[in-house]
A protein has these predicted regions:
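Structural loop-to-beta junction motif characteristic of Rossmann-like glycosyltransferase folds
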Residues: 54, 118-119, 259-260, 277-285, ...
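Donor-nucleotide binding loops and adjacent catalytic segments primarily
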Residues: 38, 43, 48, 52, ...
């Protein structure tokens, strides 16, 4: 009988791409597995998943933390609606497993799966779990975590340290991707899938200070949509070799070519950076829930695999200093690259895939299989 898996996650690339990595790994194992995603219409998933060939069910959902009073109230209103939508979708889909990989939709979908007694796996990306995953961990069957530091927040019999899931193309050997032209120092600037205004501004300021080195530097810069025109105009007038885009596809190749990565400190970004063995200047998003990005970044800083710059300390001068240190001390850069590579976890997706397969096999053995249980519910879903 064909197995069905529903994955909840999205909003940003940091939550979406681990889900895609898992979906592709499951399909490689068994092409007959049917996979669907649950996300929101406004999230990145609405653009990416159709292109990747996966079904997407959209529900009403929004974050609660870091919102103003009116926005928080609207988020609370959406929560029961999104949960009802999730439950109706699960009853129709009759999945054998639900996987929550973070993002606004994980909570409603996992809660619905628990009510319907569908096996559940959640994946916690950050070193310190958020309140939602701490609570969801109590009702799920299994929990996969990226950092060993976060395992203590969940039951020992449920939790497995897997690392953070990344797409297959990030797991190739170092030599699989050629570096850029010999002698050219390549800086990759990222603000996440939505861009980061403070990083964009600091980088534009740094260009003037780096003028004497512009013959040695190429900059690839993902700006996000809102700052794209402004940033592109500054680069065009700077004389630097550059590639400026609102969003970059084929990110693995960009990482492989990079000499230095300037980026936020989301768990997925750090997993990709370390899998490729790249040195990073980490600028944590200051409004991340529970300050988890700074905590993530400090793991790399402690291993001498990256440099931490807090957002309120960010300036063109700080960026210039970081680039020049990396450019002018190749031995230090090489040592940090090795440290980064050693931190990389290139089999995390396979570990999570195996947990999924174990749960699917276990569900088939049990008489109270999720699909049969759902048949006992008589609901009208419109």
């Amino acid at each position: 009988m064909r197995k069905r898996v529903v994955i909840a996650g999205g909003g940003t690339g940091g939550h979406l791409y681990p889900g895609i990595a898992l979906a592709k790994a499951l399909k490689r194992q068994d092409m007959d597995i049917e996979i669907a995603f649950v996300g929101t219409q406004k999230g990145l998933e609405a653009k990416v998943l159709p292109r990747e060939g996966f079904e997407l069910k959209t529900i009403l959902s929004a974050g609660l933390l870091g919102k103003k009073r009116l926005s928080r109230w609207m988020s609370w209103v959406k929560l029961p609606v999104g949960t009802a939508q999730s439950m109706c979708f699960l009853i129709r889909k009759r999945p054998d497993l639900v996987v929550g990989v973070g993002g606004y939709t994980s909570g409603p979908l996992v809660l619905s799966a628990w009510i319907l007694r569908i096996p559940i796996l959640i994946h916690e990306q950050n070193s310190i779990p958020g309140l939602t995953n701490k609570w969801l961990g109590k009702i799920t069957d299994k929990v996969a975590v990226s950092f060993k530091e976060s395992a203590r927040f969940f039951s020992r019999d449920k939790v497995t340290v897997t690392g953070n899931m990344i797409r297959e193309e990030f797991c190739q050997p170092r030599e699989a991707f050629p570096k850029g032209p010999r002698g050219l120092f390549r800086v990759l600037v990222l603000g996440g899938s939505q861009g980061a205004h403070s990083i964009n501004v600091a980088m534009m300021e740094a260009l003037e200070s780096l003028t004497s080195k512009r013959g040695n530097i190429h900059i690839t810069h993902q700006t996000g949509e809102s700052d794209f025109a402004m940033v592109k105009r500054v680069y065009e007038n700077s004389g630097f070799s550059h590639d400026v885009r609102p969003f970059i596809d084929g990110m693995a190749e960009q990482y492989r070519k990079a000499s230095l990565v300037i980026c936020r400190a989301g768990a997925t970004t750090l997993a990709e950076v370390t899998a490729c063995g790249k040195v990073s200047v980490l600028i944590p998003y200051p409004h991340a829930a529970h300050n988890h990005q700074e905590k993530n970044a400090r793991v790399l800083e402690a291993a001498n695999a990256g440099e931490l710059v807090l957002d309120h300390e960010l300036s063109g001068t700080r960026i210039t200093q970081s680039i020049l240190r990396a450019l002018e001390d190749p031995q230090r850069l090489e040592e940090m690259e090795e440290n980064s590579y050693q931190l990389g976890n290139r089999d995390a997706t396979e570990k999570v895939r195996q947990i999924c397969m174990d749960l699917l096999e276990d569900a088939n053995r049990k008489s109270g299989h999720a699909g049969k249980t759902q048949g006992n519910y008589v609901l009208s879903c419109f």
